[in-house]
Amino acid sequence: MAKALITYASMSGNTEDIAFIIKDTLQEYELDIDCVEINDMDASCLTSYDYVLIGTYTWGDGDLPYEAEDFFEEVKQIQLNGLKTACFGSGDYSYPKFCEAVNLFNVMLQEAGAAVYQETLKIELAPETDEDVESCRAFARGFLAWADYMNKEKIHVS
């Protein structure tokens, strides 16, 4: 069984809500999933997973949240060798750099050698509408299809 990690930073609970919608969707495909807050995550464990999804909110004018800074710096030091990854997060359009921390993680993962799903998921505040929830679910399914999981395991994503 393929192993996936979803790790996230969430101050208001919005990014955590997104993480759990993604987790619930991925569980439909019988993945072994760990869902862990980012400040409880040891970056050296990333390479023990087949898939890693990182979620974050953006602090202030485009900064990483405090609780994600150490993890971010630790991951930069690891060679990820094609590890399949994706980034998601929540933000507020009233700030000039909407969900910029998601972009920062996306670029850093590429620089660390990960294979990065280029379709990031960015939700305004909380995933409260049916459309937001479906966007989260579609992101999870799209990531799996991109990662070629379906072909390996003969599972059809619907």
Swiss-Prot record:
Domain Flavodoxin-like: residue ranges: 4-144
Pfam name, any one: Flavodoxin_1
Keywords: Electron transport, Flavoprotein, FMN, Transport
Required cofactor(s): FMN
GO molecular function, one term: FMN binding
Residues passing through the membrane, by range: none
Record InterPro entries: Flav_short, Flavdoxin-like, Flavodoxin, Flavodoxin/NO_synth, Flavoprotein-like_sf
Summary of the function given for this chain in its UniProt record: Low-potential electron donor to a number of redox enzymes.
Family: Belongs to the flavodoxin family.
Name of this protein: Probable flavodoxin 1
Record organism: Bacillus subtilis (strain 168)
Native organism taxonomy: Bacteria, Bacillati, Bacillota, Bacilli, Bacillales
